[in-house]
Amino acid sequence: MTRVLTALVLAAGLAIPTAAAAQPSLKNPASLTEKAPATYKVRLDTSSGPVVIQVTRDWAPLGADRFYNLVKHGFYDGVRFFRVIPGFMAQGGMNGDPAIQKIWGRNNINDDPVKQSNKRGFVTFAKTGAPNSRSTQIFINYANNANLDAQGFAPFGEVISGMEVVDKFEAYKNVPDQGLITAEGNAYLQRDYPKLTFIKKATIEK
């Protein structure tokens, strides 16, 4: 389990484009600071099926705001869940365009206090062992991972529809290399791990 938890620390198939065309706004993280609503829903249309996440801002305000802005500006479109460990969690959130990932991978937000436990279906930003190291990667808990709470992993939302879809995400476990994802983006993942579940489109539901 120690090895699995350590792997949560970040180095921060269909014929589809290797990366979604980035919106110009994604090149300027400083402009994407809109405050999220108190609650909102995000629909992930994935290659495995639809998943709906309900976000509660009070649980983790900074995380909820970051997720809201990234979804609104198309960051997660085309993104793969590159690390899926059955019984633990499914992790994704590295942009398929290396230039965009380079910008956001070093644009961290401060930590939120942990108000909710990492229960099955809860959605959380990944982080390193250092303070204030959350950027864009998120994970969905497959199990009740309360041991993550004391490590500062603060859930900001939960899957309210489609958890059975999440359970079917393609699992290559720890095989994909985050360094190569950073360097090559979706081109690397599509070439070497073509069955990875990916987000076709992430949208904020009205």
Language-model features: where?
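Bacterial N-terminal signal peptides that target proteins for export
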Residues: M1-L8
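Cyclophilin-like peptidyl-prolyl cis-trans isomerases
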Residues: G13, A19-K206
